[in-house]
C-alpha cells in the first residue's frame, strides 16, 4: 500500500507543492548568520521547491538523502509510474541546504546540482513504501567544493544500516508555507517504534509535520557539536501532521548509498 505522503508525490509536485525552509538565525551585529540545521534543505527545480532533503556523511561529501516519492513516481504491479513534474529531469533538479526566508526564499549555502538519483526498484516498480528512500549524487561547485564541505563536514550524520526500530530520534522537516508562513523548521526529538498499521515501518508521534516534510532525516544519537548522530531513515508519510512514518534503512538502502557515493 502506498503511503500517505507529506511531500511531493508525482501529482503533488506537478501542482507545485512548496516545502517550507530552514530558518536562519541572526547573531549579534557583525556576526555570521547561524544555520541551526545546515545539512538540511529543500529540493528545487524550475524555480519551485518541495520536499525535504539532507546531506549524509560520505567519503566524497557528495550524497544527499530524501524520500523516493520526492524524486520518482511509484510503480504498480511491476509497471513504472509516470513522471508528472518536468523539473524531475536530472539536469534541472537541485538541492538548497539551509534554504530560508519567505516567498521564494534565499539559499545561504548555495544551490547544488543533482548529478544522479538512486531509487530502489521496489519503489519504482511496485510502490513499496518500505523502500521509500532515495540517495542523490551532488555535483561539486565551481570551486571544486563538495556540498558536505559547504554545510560543514562534521555536521552530517553517518548512515546506519542495521538500526533497530526503537531509538531516540531527532526529525527535522520543513512544512509547506500554508502551515508555516515564517518558513521556520520544525524538529522533534522523541522515541521511534514500529508503526502499528505497518510494523515494517518506523513511527513517531510529533505535531507539525505537515505536507513538505517528506524526506526529513530521522537521526539517532544526535548530540551537540561534533555529534551529528546516525541517519536511520527519512520521513515517508503519515495520516496527519502528528503521525509520521519512515522506511528503516536496510542493506538495499546501503547499496543505493554506495552507488550514489561513487558519483
Which residues fall in each region the model found?
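Conserved catalytic-core segment of clan PA serine endopeptidases
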Residues: 30-38, 49, 81-144
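Solvent-exposed loop/turn segments at secondary-structure junctions
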Residues: 48-50, 60-61, 70-73, 101-103, ...
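Structural recognition of the beta-strand scaffold that forms the well-ordered cores
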Residues: 42, 63-65, 94-96, 134-137, ...
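Chymotrypsin/trypsin-fold serine protease catalytic domain
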Residues: 129-205
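Secretory targeting and sorting signals
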Residues: 1-28
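Catalytic histidine site
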Residues: 31, 35-100, 191-197, 206-207
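C-terminal cap/linker of serine protease catalytic domains
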Residues: 232, 238-263
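Catalytic nucleophile loop of clan PA
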Residues: 208-234
Amino acid at each position: 500500500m502506498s503511503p500517505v505522503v507529506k511531500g511531493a508525490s508525482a501529482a503533488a509536485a506537478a501542482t507545485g507543492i512548496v516545502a517550507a525552509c530552514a530558518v536562519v538565525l541572526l547573531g549579534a551585529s557583525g556576526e555570521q548568520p547561524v544555520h541551526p540545521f545546515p545539512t538540511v534543505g529543500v529540493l528545487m527545480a524550475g524555480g519551485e521547491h518541495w520536499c525535504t532533503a539532507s546531506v549524509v556523511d560520505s567519503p566524497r561529501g557528495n550524497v544527499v538523502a530524501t524520500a523516493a516519492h520526492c524524486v520518482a513516481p511509484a510503480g504498480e504491479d511491476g509497471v513504472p509510474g509516470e513522471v508528472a513534474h518536468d523539473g524531475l529531469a536530472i539536469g534541472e533538479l537541485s538541492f538548497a541546504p539551509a534554504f530560508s526566508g519567505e516567498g521564494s526564499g534565499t539559499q545561504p549555502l548555495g544551490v547544488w546540482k543533482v548529478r544522479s538519483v538512486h531509487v530502489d526498484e521496489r519503489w519504482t516498480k511496485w510502490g513499496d513504501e518500505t523502500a521509500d528512500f532515495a540517495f542523490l549524487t551532488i555535483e561539486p561547485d565551481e570551486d571544486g567544493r563538495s556540498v558536505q564541505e559547504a554545510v560543514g563536514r562534521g555536521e552530517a550524520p553517518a548512515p546506519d544500516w542495521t538500526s533497530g526500530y526503537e531509538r531516540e530520534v531527532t526529525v527535522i522537516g520543513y512544512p509547506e508555507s500554508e502551515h508555516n508562513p515564517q518558513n521556520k523548521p520544525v524538529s522533534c526529538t522523541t522515541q521511534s517504534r514500529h508503526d502499528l498499521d505497518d510494523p515494517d515501518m518506523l513511527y513517531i508521534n510529533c505535531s507539525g509535520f505537515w505536507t513538505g516534510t517528506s524526506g526529513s532525516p530521522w537521526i539517532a544519537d544526535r548530540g551537540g557539536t561534533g555529534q551529528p548522530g546516525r541517519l536511520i531513515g527519512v520521513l515517508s508519510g503519515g495520516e496527519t501532521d502528528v503521525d509520521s512514518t519512515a522506511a528503516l534503512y536496510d542493506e538495499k538502502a546501503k547499496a543505493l548509498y554506495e552507488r550514489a557515493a561513487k558519483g
